């Protein structure tokens, strides 16, 4: 540092080593000084170039400066200013073209760089006079150059996006400071400023700098060119150029603005000087302008007109903008940018359709950069955006104020989807139309829209823009890909740091626990069992202690530890039960008991039920009774081993939860080990009996791949939203075992047990300040604490008998028994919630006494168990009096159990008095514990029993606050009750076990009545409690129900209902005790944050109690009429009431029963009496659709009650039903047992279901709710939320002939329209067959129109296929010429399933069980699957889903997505290998061949499940599934196949029909073959919604529109999102416009010719004498005519039968030919052209007549071979020569002949290359060619107006027909032909030098006058 001065230092460049040492010493000195001067010392080092190869100099720079100044600054100095951008770039070196990585830092007007960011010394560059430009033109290496007056750097970025970011940052760093630092304004800096955008390029001709006017240096004129305005400059002059680039806005026009008198602004010309294109012509004088010698003349950047300097003043002021005027946004129309970041636009006059262009600079062959620049040259630069740089949002924001505009996306399908998604975000569907230019690889959407497969040439963009201007509009369906992803554990931040030793110890403990659990489950040795049990308890205790030490303050972990201890106690209980019979009194029992005593949780504060000091619980004798009931149920006949396995798995899951909670950051491999090992270790062998066991893993015969372990994140299961228990085949048994959804924990399970140490207190403050304690509990079914006799044991029981005694509670206090803590089978799922109890609420409680009677439970041995009285604590319960229970009701403080099989003396069967076997309804319901939390009601009658209270829970005493009955303005709804809410929360299996009803869905149940032959009576359920002689009243005639029925029958009390309140109910009992139930209603709940159900959703109503009995509700339950074949009808209301109401009754009969069409009989003023009179023929019968009620509840007097008209079944039983508004009835009359099939509700009679179908419960916890695809949509929704069909009309009055007597499926189904308000018919669904109704009943329905879609079409329940085929046959017979509309055809058929799925090689989903259980007893959603997808899905159906993306083209899962994903990864890894479309296709082929060998997606059918419109589709062995929206897949493959058969069941595919095509992919060979062969066997279905369930725990590749990713397990729903306007190519319109423009052009030419006499006289004077070249063409013409005359005469002589007039024509042509060369000498002067007219006419007539004769008689002529050849050649030559001749009428009125002078030296060769004569004769193309041949002259004006056909003819005459296709493709007309240069010909494919010279010479000859 001795050479360093204080201010500056000038040093000659030293060798590398010495300079390094100098720098290092400088750094050390700077570091040692310790102080920094406030004024930075910036050394300036002047360096000479004497061999330093590290300094960067661009190899492109042709004018390097001799001396560059290098400035260096220290790190602390350049840190003072704000950094605009920094990062690594590659810097080009001078030697060997090398690149070196350097770290750059950009600041205001300064650029610094060094080797890395930690360097202390940076080289700095002053950017005050900066010039920067892109080095490449094809986006090859993303390099750009920076030039300043002192430095020049060539830098390279990793991607074009990064390069453009640096260029934009350089603009920001050098731009002047603006007061507002708005990011949007920064983005608009390029648009609003007129700065040039330079790039380095070379030129083929001399080019001159627009700044210094000197020629660009080098042979190739290398320099910089602006990509917008084509301004040319030297690199050294770029910084000096003025900002006069192409205008963008009105402000950029500046002083050139021209304003008219009326205030309107005219678009002026924007001139650029010099460097004009080849053969430019002055727009004023029509002479050539431009020069290669100097910079002269002007060109307009908008209209592309060129003028001389002298002619420019004569040019029109207004600029016509050019050929793309319709698409250009004139800069004078864009005034400013408004506050909402959109242009303030003033639309120009005339036609205006602005075009917004998005170009992806990376698409396809990397042609995007060329198109980007070309579009900026043709349009306003502010209309063109690079998707890579700015994305679509900027352009859409700017165009927001345009009323209508078009969007052109120049890219592949992925970018099109990106733009469409942004259009969705801005909601601009109605104001924009989208077109696609195929620049990508696949370009499927562009193919379908008609824009071709590729567009690589930007030369003819003006013509391409014209095509987009004439395009037509079509609607493109867009589909939402809704994803419900399974929660997969991800590493989180650890809560405690455990060292490697501690982690190993923790893992060892878990492994040891698993080892001991395995021994406990599998061993039969007592000593091993004792040892393993002790060791397990010690290990668990040690594990809990160690983890608790690190988490003393973690309450959630403490709870999990207590859960683990409780599960361990339950395991010990199970061991005790298992061993107590065989090893009573031995060491094992003693050991287990000691361990139980030792393992009881000792932390009272962590137990939820101990947090409330006033409440504790102990199991009572009721638990033993429940245990016995469960043990006796069919589904729980499992061995103790299986119960023990469940307990062991439960312990393992609890251990996993504890470890996972303590170590959330543990590696994924360890989590996988913990989650998968338990079931692998503890799974027992399959039960040989074939019965479904509740604890084994219910896997199918072929287990799916990578099933998700049920042990994963078990704690999340407590958050499952309340779901019905109905299950479908479409969900995997282990699917979604761990989900985390916002729902109340107490609603997670549908089973609530009584013996639960859990009290959930919810303080309801809505009803007069009264407090209601609601207790709910969940329990596990697994045989825990149950002995061999089926009795439930208490934890400390010694095997003695507990005899319950009768006990009466004559005070209000309900005892809650306390005692030792109870081991609970599902305590880990117990919600640990504590609710504080307010003291003032307790004081407000008013006591009301309750008599609670415990019935005697008689054991099998006759002994009466004794009940042990325990401690009690009293809870004040307001307003309820309970009377003694019936004998079959068991009540406790927390639960009431109704034993439906108990023998009661007061109840007998209403149909049979005989005794019989017991039918356990609880066992029929499920393998779960059926228990319901007791609910306390206000102001009940003292005479009511507990059974009455529970049975009348639907008496509207306790409802949702959203319900209409809670409103002060409305009446209560019939049937709306707490029972419905509880049923949706707890599951219908439990709640309707009390009524012996099983529901088909949580929202849709059909009130049913079953009439069968007499059977032995079963034990009565409580649902028949009040139907016997002792209890004559129905349960709905109890006091609360009486009031309801009184209002229902009154006109003064209209009812309310909404669509969400419609429910269906099916009575599935096999006994003959039938009971008509009123319809169930459900309401919507309110939600609080997190989608939890709000407490205020429940509300008590103070209803007036009516104690009087309603006689109207008494009517016979059955009426046996076995011989009555007529219709027994109920009385009806008046006609005017029925005219405003319609409802539905569905009747299901036996298979053998036939459907009878019943006609309604109108009988007004009849009151609920059975009518036996036969029905009368009503008026005009109409086929009425099913009426679905609107979503909005009705109010007030708009609804009147009515009584439905019900038919009598053919079985003889009269279906008696009273329907109020809102009732839907169904009567099941099949003789066989009908039971809803579910894992929780197996059939009573159909036992074979259990083997194959009862496997939708979870393997480790069958009571825990699992999801299925349809019900998962109800997550986070109201407990009583119903499935709604969106409002829309699907009603249509059908032809009466279609309503035939026909039974469908296994049932006879009849539908009756009964009651519905006519003004609320928002949604209607068509069901066939329909029953005629009188017109007066439906005043408004007949006018509604809609689709013909069937409600059950596509469902497996009813076989409507033959109905559809019958209708199809009928339509074909009725009128074959009549074409059905696509909408009717679509809605009539969908979903269309391929019949091949029913072949033996496709798997059958109907194996095992009966058709009834799988179809009728499935969800109501299945029945409505064909209707609801037609509508927009309700938001509640998609709760829990999120939109992953939007599909426009196709969706693929499996092998195709795997190939796309591999290609994407390859392109990201090696982008240089994927820059060509051909290379991309090659990579696709290679990756597809790779899949042919690897088969990574093999057995995909085991990993996914497919549903189409709600119908499960069986899948064969396949590797992929493709769902098509457009008929093009992965690069133009018609994967669906073309439909050629007339009897094809599928609809023709289209992208605007709202229909998806589902296709199976069997392998890569099929994908390759589908490009060549029309394959159809792989079709699966056509539908309107698709659901795919991904099973297992591995991700599966998925692609949407070519964009692929890995999708985790979950559910995918494809639903219709919206439609967007797309521009399709309209070729017919293009041809019409082209022909019209051609006519206009010809007309203008004729006008100009008539007007310009001087030009015509000049033409006449020059054309009088035939030139030398024309003379040569004339000789060839004479030769051709002579030859043709000769051979035609010879033909006539050889065949005298031919016409002799042809011989005369030949002689006349010969004479005319002789007249132009008398005595062998051609005429001279003007007379020759006049004589030639006669020769041309006669020779043309001879040619035409000869061709006509040969065409007519050629098939019968037998010519000599030589004659045929010579005649063909003569005719061909004659045709070619005639094309060169033209006859024109001159000014003097005479006709003269002219010849086209076209390369006469090679005319003979050209004739030989023409098409064969006979081919032209047979195709008839000769006449067609003649009509397009306009008259031609040798003048430039004529050639300038040539069409494409004439240019092609011109090429053929030059024997250059090989270039015809290229000229046609590029639409080369006469105007373009005259301006073609060498470079243009090269672009057109003319590469041969000789051909180029000939074409250029011919063009020159055409241009000469």
Swiss-Prot record:
Broad enzyme group: transferase
Segments forming domain DAGKc: 350-486
Classification via SMART domains: C1, DAGKa, DAGKc, PH, SAM
E.C. no: 2.7.1.107
Bias (Polar residues) ranges: 1164-1176
Any one GO MF annotation of this record: ATP-dependent diacylglycerol kinase activity
Zinc finger (Phorbol-ester/DAG-type): 195-245, 268-319
Keyword ATP-binding: yes
Keyword Transferase: yes
GO biological process terms on file: glycerolipid metabolic process; phospholipase C-activating G protein-coupled receptor signaling pathway
Regions of compositional bias (Basic and acidic residues) in chain numbering: 1-10
Disordered, as annotated region: 1-37, 621-642, 783-805, 1005-1042, 1106-1125, 1164-1199, 1367-1386
Residue spans of biased composition, Low complexity class: 23-37
InterPro entries tied to this protein: ATP-NAD_kinase_N, C1-like_sf, DGK, DGKD_4H, Diacylglycerol_kin_accessory, Diacylglycerol_kinase_cat_dom, NAD/diacylglycerol_kinase_sf, PE/DAG-bd
Major localization listed first in the record, in broad terms: cytoplasm
Family in the record: Belongs to the eukaryotic diacylglycerol kinase family.
Protein role: Phosphorylates diacylglycerol (DAG) to generate phosphatidic acid (PA).
Protein name per UniProt: Diacylglycerol kinase eta
């Amino acid at each position: 540092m001795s050479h360093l001065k204080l201010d500056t230092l000038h040093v000659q460049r030293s060798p590398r080593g010495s300079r390094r040492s100098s720098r290092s010493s400088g750094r050390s000195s700077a570091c040692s000084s310790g102080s920094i001067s406030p004024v930075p010392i910036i050394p300036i080092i002047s360096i000479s170039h004497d061999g330093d190869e590290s300094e960067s100099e661009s190899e492109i720079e042709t004018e390097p400066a001799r001396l560059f100044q290098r400035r260096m600054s220290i790190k602390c100095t350049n840190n003072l200013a704000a950094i605009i951008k920094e990062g690594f770039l590659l810097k080009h070196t001078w030697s060997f073209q090398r690149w070196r990585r350097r770290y750059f830092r950009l600041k205001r007007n300064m650029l610094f760089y060094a080797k890395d960011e930690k360097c202390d010394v940076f080289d700095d560059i002053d950017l005050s006079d900066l010039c920067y430009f892109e080095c490449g033109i094809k986006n090859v290496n993303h390099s750009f150059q920076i030039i300043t007056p002192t430095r020049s750097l060539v830098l390279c970025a990793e991607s074009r996006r990064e390069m453009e970011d640096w260029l934009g940052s350089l603009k920001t760093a050098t731009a002047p400071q603006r007061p507002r630092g708005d990011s949007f304004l920064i983005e608009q800096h390029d648009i609003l400023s007129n700065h040039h955008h330079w790039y380095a390029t070379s030129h083929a001709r001399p080019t001159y700098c627009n700044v210094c006017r000197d020629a660009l240096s080098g042979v190739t004129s290398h320099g910089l060119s602006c990509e917008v305005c084509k301004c040319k400059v030297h690199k050294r002059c770029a910084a000096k150029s003025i900002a006069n680039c192409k205008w963008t806005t009105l402000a950029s026009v500046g002083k050139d603005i021209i304003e008219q008198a009326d205030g309107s602004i005219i678009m002026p010309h924007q001139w650029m000087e010099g460097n004009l294109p080849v053969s430019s012509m002055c727009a004023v004088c029509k002479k050539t302008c431009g020069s290669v010698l100097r910079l002269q003349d002007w060109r307009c950047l908008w209209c592309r007109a060129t003028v001389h300097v002298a002619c420019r003043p004569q040019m029109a002021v207004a600029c016509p903008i050019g050929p793309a005027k319709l698409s250009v946004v004139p800069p004078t129309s864009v005034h400013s940018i408004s506050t909402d970041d959109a242009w303030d636009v003033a639309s120009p006059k005339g036609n205006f359709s602005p075009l917004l262009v998005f170009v992806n600079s990376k698409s396809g062959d990397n042609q995007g950069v060329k198109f980007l620049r070309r579009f900026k040259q043709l349009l306003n630069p502010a209309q063109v955006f690079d998707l890579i740089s700015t994305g679509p949002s900027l352009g859409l924001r700017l165009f927001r104020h345009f009323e209508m505009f078009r969007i052109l996306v120049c890219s592949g399908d992925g970018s099109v989807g990106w733009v469409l998604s942004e259009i969705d975000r801005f909601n601009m569907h109605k104001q924009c139309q989208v077109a696609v230019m195929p620049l990508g690889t696949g370009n499927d959407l562009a193919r379908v829209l008609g824009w071709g497969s590729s567009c690589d040439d930007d030369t003819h963009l003006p013509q391409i823009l014209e095509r987009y201007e004439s395009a037509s509009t079509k609607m493109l369906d867009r589909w939402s890909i809704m994803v419900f992803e399974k929660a997969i554990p991800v590493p989180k931040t650890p809560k405690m740091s455990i060292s490697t030793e501690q982690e190993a110890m923790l893992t060892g403990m878990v492994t040891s626990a698993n080892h001991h659990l395995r021994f406990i489950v599998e061993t039969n040795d007592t000593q091993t069992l004792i040892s393993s049990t002790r060791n397990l308890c010690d290990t668990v205790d040690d594990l809990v202690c160690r983890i608790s030490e690190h988490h003393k303050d973690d309450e959630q972990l403490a709870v999990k530890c207590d859960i683990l201890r409780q599960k361990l106690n339950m395991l010990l209980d199970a061991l005790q039960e298992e061993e107590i019979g065989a090893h009573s009194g031995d060491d094992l029992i003693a050991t287990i008991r000691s361990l139980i005593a030792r393992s009881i949780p000792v932390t009272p504060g962590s137990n939820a039920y101990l947090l409330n000091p006033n409440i504790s619980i102990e199991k009572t004798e009721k638990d033993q009774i429940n245990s016995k009931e469960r043990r006796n149920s069919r589904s729980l006949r499992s061995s103790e081993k299986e119960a023990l396995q469940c307990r062991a798995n439960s312990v393992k899951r609890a251990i996993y939860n504890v470890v996972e909670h303590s170590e959330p950051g543990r590696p994924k491999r360890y989590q996988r080990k913990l989650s998968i090992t338990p079931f692998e270790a503890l799974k027992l062998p399959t039960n040989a009996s074939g019965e479904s066991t509740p604890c084994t893993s219910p896997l199918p015969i072929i287990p799916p791949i990578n099933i998700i372990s049920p042990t994963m994140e078990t704690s999340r299961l407590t958050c499952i939203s309340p779901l019905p228990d109905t299950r479908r085949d479409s969900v995997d048994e282990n699917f979604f075992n761990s989900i985390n959804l916002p729902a109340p924990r107490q609603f997670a399970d549908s089973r609530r047990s009584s013996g639960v140490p859990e009290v959930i207190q919810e303080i309801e403050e809505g009803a007069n300040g009264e407090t209601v304690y609601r207790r709910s509990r969940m329990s596990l079914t697994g045989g825990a604490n149950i002995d061999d006799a089926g009795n439930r044991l208490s934890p400390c029981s010694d095997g003695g008998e507990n005899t319950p005694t009768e006990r009466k509670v004559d005070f209000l206090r309900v005892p809650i028994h306390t005692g030792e803590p109870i081991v609970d089978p599902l305590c880990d799922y117990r919600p640990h919630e504590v609710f504080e109890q307010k003291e003032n609420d307790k004081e407000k409680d008013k006591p009301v006494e309750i008599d609670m009677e415990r019935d005697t439970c008689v054991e099998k041995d006759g002994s009466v168990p004794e009940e042990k009285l325990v401690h009690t604590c009293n809870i004040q319960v307001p307003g309820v009096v309970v009377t003694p229970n019936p004998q079959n009701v068991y009540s406790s403080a927390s639960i009431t159990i109704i034993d439906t099989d108990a023998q009661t003396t007061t109840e007998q069967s209403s149909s049979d008095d005989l005794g019989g076997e017991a039918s356990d309804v609880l066992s029929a319901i499920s393998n779960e514990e059926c228990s319901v939390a007791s609910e306390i009601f206000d102001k009940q009658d003292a005479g009511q029993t507990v059974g009455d209270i529970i049975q009348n829970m639907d008496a509207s005493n306790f409802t949702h606050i959203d319900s209409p009955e809670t409103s002060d303005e409305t009446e209560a709804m019939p049937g709306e009750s707490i029972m419905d809410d509880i049923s949706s929360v707890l599951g219908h299996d439990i709640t309707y076990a009390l009524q012996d009803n099983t529901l088909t869905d949580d929202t849709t149940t059909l009130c049913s009545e079953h009439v069968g032959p007499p059977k032995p009576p079963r034990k009565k359920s409580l649902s028949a409690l009040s139907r016997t002689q002792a209890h004559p009243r129905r349960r709905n005639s109890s006091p609360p129900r009486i009031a309801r029925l009184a209002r229902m029958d009154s006109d003064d009390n209209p009812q309310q209902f909404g669509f969400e309140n419609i429910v269906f109910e099916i009575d599935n009992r096999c006994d003959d005790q039938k009971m008509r139930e009123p319809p169930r209603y459900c309401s919507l709940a309110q939600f609080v944050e997190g989608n939890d159900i709000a407490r205020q959703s429940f509300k008590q109503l103070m209803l007036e109690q009516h104690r009087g009995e309603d006689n109207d509700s008494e009517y016979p339950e059955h009426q046996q009429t076995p011989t009555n074949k007529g219709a027994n009808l109920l009385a009806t209301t008046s006609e005017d009431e029925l005219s405003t109401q319609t409802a539905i009754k569905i009747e299901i009969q036996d298979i053998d029963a036939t459907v009878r069409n019943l006609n309604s009989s109108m009988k007004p003023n009849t009151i609920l009496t059975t009518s036996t009179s036969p029905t009368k023929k009503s008026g005009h019968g109409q086929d009425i659709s099913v009426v679905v009620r609107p979503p909005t509840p009705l109010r007030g007097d708009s609804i009147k009650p009515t009584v439905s008209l019900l038919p009598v079944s053919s079985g003889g039983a009269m279906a008696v039903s009273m329907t109020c508004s809102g009732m839907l009835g169904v009567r099941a009359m099949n003789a066989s047992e009908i039971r809803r099939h579910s894992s929780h509700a197996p059939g009573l009679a159909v036992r074979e279901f259990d083997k194959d179908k009862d496997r939708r419960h979870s393997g480790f916890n069958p009571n825990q709710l699992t999801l299925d695809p349809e019900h998962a949509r109800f997550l986070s929704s109201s407990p009583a939320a119903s499935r709604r069909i969106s409002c829309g009309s699907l009603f249509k009055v059908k032809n009466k002939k279609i309503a035939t007597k026909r039974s469908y499926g296994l049932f006879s189904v009849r539908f009756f329209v009964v009651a519905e308000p006519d003004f609320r018919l928002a949604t209607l669904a068509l069901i066939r067959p329909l029953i005629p109704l009188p017109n007066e009943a439906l005043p408004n329905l007949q006018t509604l129109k809609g689709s013909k879609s069937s409600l059950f079409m596509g469902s497996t329940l009813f076989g409507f296929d033959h109905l559809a085929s019958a209708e199809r046959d009928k339509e074909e017979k009725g009128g074959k010429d009549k074409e059905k509309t696509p909408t009717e055809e679509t809605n009539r058929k969908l979903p269309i399933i391929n019949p091949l799925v029913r072949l033996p090689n496709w798997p059958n989903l109907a194996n095992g069980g009966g058709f009834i259980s799988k179809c009728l007893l499935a969800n109501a959603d299945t029945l409505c699957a064909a209707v609801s997808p037609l509508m927009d899905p309700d938001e509640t159906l998609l709760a829990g889903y999120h939109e992953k993306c939007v599909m426009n083209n196709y969706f693929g899962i499996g092998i195709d997505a795997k190939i796309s994903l591999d290609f994407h990864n390859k392109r990201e890894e090696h982008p240089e290998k994927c820059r060509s479309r051909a290379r991309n296709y090659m990579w696709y082929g290679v990756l597809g061949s790779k899949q042919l060998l690897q088969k990574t997606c093999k057995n995909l059918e085991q990993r996914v499940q497919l549903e189409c419109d709600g119908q499960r589709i069986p899948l064969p062995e396949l590797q992929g599934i493709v769902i098509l929206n457009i008929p093009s897949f992965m690069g133009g493959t018609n994967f669906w196949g073309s439909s050629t058969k007339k009897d094809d069941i599928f609809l023709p595919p289209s992208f605007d029909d709202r229909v998806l095509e589902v296709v199976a992919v069997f392998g890569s060979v099929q994908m390759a073959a589908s490009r060549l062969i029309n394959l159809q066997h792989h079709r699966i279905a056509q539908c309107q919604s698709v659901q795919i369930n991904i099973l297992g725990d591995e991700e599966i590749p998925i692609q949407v529109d070519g964009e692929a990713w890995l999708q985790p397990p979950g559910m995918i729903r494809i639903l219709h999102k919206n439609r967007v306007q797309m521009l399709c190519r309209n070729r017919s319109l293009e041809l019409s416009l082209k022909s019209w423009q051609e006519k206009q052009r010809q007309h203008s030419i004729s006008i100009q010719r008539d007007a310009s006499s001087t030009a015509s006289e000049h033409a006449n004077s020059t054309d009088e004498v035939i030139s030398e070249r024309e003379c040569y063409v004339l000789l060839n013409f004479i030769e051709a005519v002579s030859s043709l005359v000769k051979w035609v005469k010879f033909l006539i002589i050889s065949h005298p039968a031919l016409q002799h007039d042809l011989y005369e024509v030949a002689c006349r042509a010969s004479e005319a030919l002789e007249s132009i060369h008398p005595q062998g000498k051609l005429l001279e002067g003007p007379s020759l052209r006049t004589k030639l007219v006669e020769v041309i006419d006669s020779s043309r007539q001879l040619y035409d007549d000869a061709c006509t004769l040969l065409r007519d008689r050629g098939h019968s002529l037998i010519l000599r071979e030589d004659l045929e050849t010579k005649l063909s050649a003569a005719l061909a030559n004659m045709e070619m020569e005639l094309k060169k001749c033209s006859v024109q009428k001159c000014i003097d009125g005479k006709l003269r002949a002219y010849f086209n002078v076209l390369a006469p030296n090679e005319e003979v060769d050209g004739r030989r290359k023409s098409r064969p004569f006979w081919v032209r004769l047979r195709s008839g193309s000769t006449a067609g060619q003649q009509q397009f041949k306009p008259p031609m002259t040798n003048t430039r004006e004529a050639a300038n107006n040539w069409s494409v056909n004439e240019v092609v003819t011109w090429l053929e005459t030059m024997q250059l027909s090989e270039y015809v296709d290229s000229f046609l493709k590029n639409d080369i007309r006469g105007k373009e032909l005259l301006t073609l240069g060498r470079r243009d010909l090269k672009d057109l494919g003319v590469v041969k030098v000789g051909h180029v010279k000939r074409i250029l010479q011919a063009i020159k000859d055409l241009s000469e006058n």
